[in-house]
Amino acid sequence: MIMHHGRESKRRRRQVIKIPNDDVLEEIIVRLPVKTLTRFQTVSKHWRHTIKSRNGSKPSIRYKTMRLEWSLSRLVGEEEYLTSKKHKERRILFSKSVDGLFCLYSGVDMKQPIMVINPDTRWSKKLPLARIQRKNYLDSNKVEFSRLGFGKDSVTGTYKLAVIPPPPNHGIKHENMSF
């Protein structure tokens, strides 16, 4: 009998509880952090496919993006209270979030590289200096960019960065970078 009981408990452990509806699975996946999603890809081929598929990952990314944009807007609101000269010299700006990624850049020091960051996975990448930034290395005139556009090309799936100088732009046009 003890052997029979042991076999029975093994059977229970091996039972797979199937989630009846893929919509329910997607609703669960949407709320999970990226690290957990990575682990859950080993559960089954079906889960791996659901997590990696466009339909499975886009709601998750959309959810994370919404959450990230909200937190960034809160940071912007808090940053306005820092008005000392020291803080203005170190002013760090950031772009809107795209697929959980956003760019950090200096609004004052053009010699600092632009960084792309994914806070969920703790991934970051320093981008090569844009032409406008390289010009700032050579010129003593300070050329700043007033806007940094960050987006994703829906056809190719590549991320695009547009660096736009403020007027008067001294003949420098906007610059697009892909990565």
Curated annotation (Swiss-Prot):
SUPFAM superfamilies on file: F-box domain
InterPro entries: F-box-like_dom_sf (IPR036047), F-box_dom (IPR001810), SCF_F-box_component (IPR050796)
Domain F-box: 19-55
Pfam family, one: F-box
Listed name of the protein: Probable F-box protein At3g25550
Protein species of origin: Arabidopsis thaliana (Mouse-ear cress)
